[in-house]
Structure formats: C-alpha cells, structure tokens
C-alpha cells in the first residue's frame, strides 16, 4: 500500500531506503507487463517525489536495477557507460526506474543511486526461477519425473545474493553519488549448470525436456556479462565467486 509506505517514511524519517520490491521475473513480465511496470516504476517514483516534496534530503535511496536493461547488443561485457536496449517488459521497467532515479539525483539533488545487478541467487529465491526449479527438481524428484525447461543455450553472469547485498550497502553509503554495475564478471551457460546438477544428482538426461513452449520467451538475451571493475576501483567490492 503506497499510502502506508509514505506515511511510515514521514513518521520514521529513515536514514536509508532500499527499494527491492516489484515484479522481478523476466518470463512473467511478458504475460503481465502492467504489473511489472507499476511495481517497478510507480512506487519508486512516489517515494522519490515524496522525499523531494518534503525536503527529506538526508535520506539515502537505493534503487535496484538489472543488467536485463542492457538487452542484446554486440558488446557482451556491460559497464556503467553502455546504453540500455531492453528486450523484455522487465528490462524496460528497470531501465525507466534507473533513469528516474538518476533524474531525481541530478535535477533535485537527492541522494539516490541505482545498482545495475546481474542475476543473483540464494536459498530464498522464488521456486519459479530457473536455477531454483532445477535444484528443487534434483533434490525432490519423483520416479520418471521430467524437468521441463525453455532455451538452455543462454549465458548469464550468476552471482551470490549475500555478496551483492554487501555491494548494495556500499553503493548507498558511498560519498560519491554514482550508479554501479554489480556482478561476478564471469558467464556460464544454463546448459552447463543443468548438466552439472544432473551429473552430481545421477539423473539421466532422458529426464530433461528443453525448448518447452511454456518456458520460451518471445525475446531473450543470448549472452550478457557484467563488467564490475568500476565498483572495485571506487568501493573495493569484488565477488569472491
């Protein structure tokens, strides 16, 4: 409830705000773009405007953006200077939230920043996300059960969420008001991950079905890799993966 959130901000006067809410599934965003746009743009907009209007300039606001905003271009290695060219409603929404945050920082002087995060995983990951689905399948598989996946020939920069939280805290508390790309700087294919998990779990590949229609996205990024050198240079953060 936006009204409740804004009321709490005015009442508590927090030192820091971290916006992690919003529909975050790329696949789901194709089927429910309205929810994706509203949840990733509307509330950050309201919070930023509330901070500006009430002159709460001491608040440090962090907006969580995504490397999905970069889309598919010839250059795979993405840094803070690369243009956005998103292929999904999710990527579009995150792009908008990035520019919105940057606008309020540069125009109104708010202490607000974005982290452009690559994929990151943890045990808390929603069961509908692909790596969580693969791991849950391997752990809880029933006899003759088949794992259905979409395109597994994609490459992603997969990181560890607890590490990324450290980077996020550094970004929001840095003296400089800058946005940063956060990732491992390495890529691995989904196909490789599936094969590793199946091998470790001693599951025959005949129980894997790929290119399943319900999991194929209308548009998908083939390869994307983060270039996190700037955050290491400025804030001394680096993934241990």
Residue ranges and their predicted role:
Residues 1-120:
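N-terminal Rossmann-like NAD(P)+-binding domain of SDR-like oxidoreductases, especially those catalyzing
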Residues 3, 125-129, 188:
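Conserved catalytic/ATP-binding subdomain
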Residues 41-49, 128, 162-165, 169:
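Conserved active-site region of classical short-chain dehydrogenase/reductase
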Residues 44-52, 102, 133-137, 191-196:
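Short, well-ordered amphipathic alpha-helices
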Residues 70-73, 123-125, 189-191, 220:
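A short beta-to-alpha transition loop/helix N-cap that caps and shapes the active-site region
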Residues 82, 86-93, 123, 127-131, ...:
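The catalytic Tyr-centered alpha-helix of NAD(P)H-dependent dehydrogenases
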Residues 131-132, 138-241:
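C-terminal substrate-binding subdomain of Rossmann-fold SDR/epimerase-dehydratase oxidoreductases
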